């Protein structure tokens, strides 16, 4: 569901900026193909175990280049491959479409994490600081709509994809809140440890069998 939401947000932004919607959607649909079970928790444990480390964006590129179609790969164009690789990490994609997916991914995952935390009883709607909600919206749909429209308006006529200062600052504050209230929450950390232990055990099993 995360990938489909990223694709929907990214395509909406691309349409609003009169950019290549198909290229944007292709990057979005491929961006997390190499992700581990349990998301970033799984990625961290594989990064510790594997001699060369592990990055899910690099694995996503490996999936489309080397693993699909029984090793033949999908023969994707440079722009799609580069967008997949650069949706996270220090390097930005050269295309605006690739940059759109990068920001759409951030919009989607933080809102998805909020929903998960609320379903798990870790946080409640009124826990989100009021100054953040007044800028971004008070529910999932409101935040998605606000952030999507903001990227379109802030990026129109520019040579890069960006957010307005107000929404960028609110997003940064929201991330800080999520780290304090959710990501470092003892309940969430306990579940993360279970997930990491499971992946480590599976890795050891497949290595020895």
Residue ranges and their predicted role:
Residues 23-49, 57:
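Aspartate-rich (DDxxD/NDxxD/DxxxD) Mg2+/diphosphate-binding motifs
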Residues 1, 7-13, 18-22, 54-209:
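Histidine-centered, transition-metal-coordinating active-site segments
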Residues 1-2, 35:
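Catalytic phosphate-handling regions of large nucleic-acid enzymes and associated NTPases
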Residues 3-5, 42-43:
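Active/ligand-binding-proximal structured segments within catalytic/core domains
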């Amino acid at each position: 569901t995360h990938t489909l939401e990223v694709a929907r947000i990214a395509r909406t932004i691309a349409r609003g900026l009169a950019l290549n919607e198909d290229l944007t959607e292709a990057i979005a649909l491929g961006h997390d193909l190499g992700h581990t079970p349990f998301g970033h928790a799984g990625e961290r444990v594989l990064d510790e175990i594997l001699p060369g480390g592990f990055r899910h964006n690099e694995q996503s590129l490996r999936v489309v280049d080397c693993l699909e179609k029984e090793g033949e790969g999908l023969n994707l164009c440079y722009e799609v491959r580069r967008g997949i690789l650069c949706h996270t990490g220090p390097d930005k994609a050269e295309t605006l479409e690739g940059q759109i997916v990068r920001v759409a991914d951030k919009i989607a995952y933080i809102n998805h994490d909020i929903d998960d935390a609320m379903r798990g009883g870790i946080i409640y709607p009124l826990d989100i600081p009021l100054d953040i909600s007044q800028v971004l919206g008070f529910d999932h749909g409101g935040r998605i709509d606000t952030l999507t429209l903001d990227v379109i308006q802030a990026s129109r006529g520019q040579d890069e994809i960006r957010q307005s200062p107000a929404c960028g600052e609110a997003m940064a504050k929201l991330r800080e809140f999520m780290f304090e209230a959710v990501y470092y929450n003892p309940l969430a950390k306990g579940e993360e440890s279970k997930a990491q232990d499971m992946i480590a055990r599976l890795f050891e099993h497949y290595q020895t069998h």
